[in-house]
Structure formats: C-alpha cells, structure tokens
C-alpha cells in the first residue's frame, strides 16, 4: 500500500510538471523527448546541479556558473521557485566587475556558513576583493548566460519588479538585479 501510494505521488508530481507546457510536432519521438525527457533532465540538473557527475566532482564542489545558468533557464515554467533560487545564487556569485565565479558553493554567501574553514581553489568566501580570482582568470561567457535566464524567468512569471531587488556581490557590496545584469554586459 505504501509503495502504491509513493508511486502514485511520484506519478502525480511528474504529471503536474510535464503538464505545464506541451509541445506537439508531427514526430511522436520528438514530442516525448521534448515534453518528458528534456524537462526531466533539466529539473534534475537544477535540483542537484551536476554534483552527481564524476567529471564535475573530481575534488571540486559547488555550482558551475555557466551550467547552472543554462539549466535554470529551462525550467521557469515548471519550477519557477527553484529557477529563482538558482538565479539568486548566481547573482550572489557575481563579482561587481561583472564576471561570475566559475565554480562556487552558494553556502559561502550564507552568514552562518562563512566560517566553515573550507578553502576553495576558485574563491575564498570572504569580502576581501584581493582573495577572489581576478578577471584574467574569469571565463568570459559564464555570466552572460545569466541574462537570458533572468529574461526567461521574468517572461514566465511576470515578476518584472525582480530586476529591482537588491542582491549582494561576491566581492562585497550589493546592487539591483538590473545593475548585476548591466555589469555582466559591460564586462563582456
């Protein structure tokens, strides 16, 4: 009985997710790929990032900036809350000059977790600008992917005022989402 209940709950969960957007093409295989498997992969990637990948795990932990932005832009219709959470984490992982930290753990920017002693090869979670990698070590396109992710989120949710929200930078200070996006474009 518990197994049947759990199975039915799981089925209902995915029915709800997949029911938010349905694409119809003349090819049933394409329909299944787009409406089921692509959405499933996107949801799983956004929920657990790519931590499960042996390629990504190799001694590193955290969110890959580009991967996370690309994953987030695929789910605002099916999981707007998680999409916004990832976008806000990426905004926190942006340096005021406009480049993203290529790999970072969102927990670094949570006050209660700043003093856990973890030493990252990418960034040390302190507000000292000289402790964060400089633009010469930045991947120029990482943060650019956040722009369409925010656009897709706003188009889907209608939360236009999201661009006015103040969000901290990784290297200290804060600015609105709009100013973060402008910094990204100016850097690139």
Range-by-range predicted roles:
Residues 63, 68, 72-83, 87-188:
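Aromatic-rich carbohydrate-recognition surfaces in CAZymes
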Residues 1-62, 161-178, 182-185:
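Acidic/polar, glycine-enriched structural segments that form the non-catalytic walls/loops
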């Amino acid at each position: 009985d518990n197994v049947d209940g759990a199975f039915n709950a799981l089925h209902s969960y995915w029915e709800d997710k997949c029911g938010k957007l349905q694409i119809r093409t003349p090819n049933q295989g394409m329909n299944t790929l787009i409406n089921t498997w692509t959405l499933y992969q996107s949801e799983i990637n956004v929920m657990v990032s790519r931590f499960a990948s042996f390629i990504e795990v190799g001694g590193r932990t955290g969110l890959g900036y580009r991967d996370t932005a690309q994953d987030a832009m695929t789910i605002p219709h099916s999981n707007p809350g998680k999409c916004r959470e990832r976008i806000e984490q990426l905004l926190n992982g942006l340096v005021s000059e406009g480049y993203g930290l290529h790999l970072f753990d969102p927990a670094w920017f949570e006050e209660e977790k700043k003093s856990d002693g973890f030493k990252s090869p990418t960034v040390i979670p302190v507000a000292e600008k000289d402790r964060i990698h400089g633009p010469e070590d930045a991947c120029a396109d990482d943060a650019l992917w956040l722009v369409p992710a925010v656009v897709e989120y706003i188009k889907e949710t209608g939360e236009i005022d999201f661009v006015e929200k103040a969000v901290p930078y990784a290297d200290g200070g804060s600015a609105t989402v709009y100013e973060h996006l402008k910094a990204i474009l100016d850097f690139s």
